[in-house]
From Swiss-Prot:
Gene: spaS
Keywords from the UniProt entry: Antibiotic, Antimicrobial, Bacteriocin, Lantibiotic, Thioether bond
Top-rank taxon: Bacteria
Any one Pfam family match given in the protein's UniProt record, by short name: Gallidermin
Post-translational modification (record): Maturation of lantibiotics involves the enzymatic conversion of Thr, and Ser into dehydrated AA and the formation of thioether bonds with cysteine. This is followed by membrane translocation and cleavage of the modified precursor.
Keyword flag Transferase: no
2,3-didehydroalanine (Ser) found at: S29, S55
Sites of (Z)-2,3-didehydrobutyrine modification: T42
Record location of the Beta-methyllanthionine (Thr-Cys) cross-link: T32-C35, T37-C43, T47-C50, T49-C52
Function: Lanthionine-containing peptide antibiotic (lantibiotic) active on Gram-positive bacteria. The bactericidal activity of lantibiotics is based on depolarization of energized bacterial cytoplasmic membranes, initiated by the formation of aqueous transmembrane pores.
Protein's UniProt name: Lantibiotic subtilin
Family (UniProt): Belongs to the type A lantibiotic family.
Note: Subtilin activity is observed during stationary phase, but not during exponential growth.
Residues with the N2-succinyltryptophan modification: W25
Amino acid sequence: MSKFDDFDLDVVKVSKQDSKITPQWKSESLCTPGCVTGALQTCFLQTLTCNCKISK
């Protein structure tokens, strides 16, 4: 592994006692208020555009 010393992947070893996996990023919705699970609740377009109005 000495060939890969120039890469810092921010990997941390944990013991088996502390092996609970927790996400570092949590969110109720991607960016649209009122759409709790984002794209899964049929508001994919609003989630995709962050509830912005697009006009000519």
